[in-house]
Amino acid sequence: MSHPGNLRAITAMLAACAMFSCMDALLKALAGTYPPFQVTALRGLSAMPLVCIYVLWRRELGVVFSRHLRWRLHLLRGVITVLMLALFTFGLKTLGLAEAYTLTFVAPLIITMLSVPILKEIVPPRHWVAIAVGMGGVVVALRPDQSAFLSVGAVAVLVAAVCYALSNVVGRVISRTEPSATLVFWTTASMALGGSLLSAAQWVDILPAHWPLLVGLAVTGFLGQLAIVEAFRHSQASAVAPFEYSALAWAVALDWVFWRAVPDVYTLAGGAIIIASGIYLIRREAPRAMVVVAP
């Protein structure tokens, strides 16, 4: 018998993927005009007002600024997140959304690998086989015998996936003692402050035509965050996490609608292998807690 909250949770996850895909499309649109660290800053600055309102509405301001917060871990996660988003934005300048998503889907495999040295978890041999198969999918997607996809942008997105995995693992450590509100607030603040400092010397004035994009960036990111929290609140991670891969369908659609780009067979085949490996790991790791805060 299915969990009573599964349908609601799956619907929330699908909505979250739609919101985050639209947000990434906006990041790609901005990446052609502004430096990567500035786009990171704009992502954080645009979302900060909504995050503050949400924290106040939830009456969690005291929790967010508690003296018992694990500040070093929050700082580490903030640095990793800023680097991750800047690299991902840099990659989007030359890659389509579907190509970028195919590479970032390797993150669950990396998270499983990192859980051994950092979280002291035991990974069964069959999981290592799934990881190896998933990495084979990356090779297929990159098709290293050609230069079309094995580019600086692709490498940047792969490094961004590693950063995302690190951020997720650090977030799992923090979430053992702190609520999700602290992760949401300080991750957003890190993007706003860190991105602003690193882009100050190269800051480009915001074009009037791009202000609606920034509003869209804030709204889609915020709604996506609420939806993904709702998804994991009403069901087990193993039931809803596989639906995160529905983002690839949105990426293909957005690529076509806005850039008339279609992923080739290598990207789709590699993506299918990576997704299959990721779903296997997610389904097998049902008891493990998952972090639901996405930048």
What is the predicted role of each segment?
Residues 8-16, 62-87, 152-160, 205-223:
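Loop-to-transmembrane-helix transition segments
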Residues 17-22, 52, 78-86, 108-113, ...:
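Hydrophobic/small/kink-forming positions within alpha-helical transmembrane segments
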Residues 28, 36-37, 51, 146-206, ...:
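Transmembrane alpha-helical segments that form core, pore/gating elements
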Residues 34-83, 163-167, 186-201:
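Transmembrane alpha-helices of multi-pass small-molecule transport proteins
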Residues 36-49, 90-107, 150-163, 207-221, ...:
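Structural signature of hydrophobic alpha-helical transmembrane segments
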Residues 88-90, 107-129, 249-268:
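C-terminal transmembrane-helix exit sites in multi-pass transporters
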Residues 101-106, 174-189, 225-256:
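Helix-helix packing/entry segments at the starts of transmembrane helices
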Residues 126-143, 266-285:
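Hydrophobic transmembrane alpha-helices of multi-pass small-molecule transport proteins
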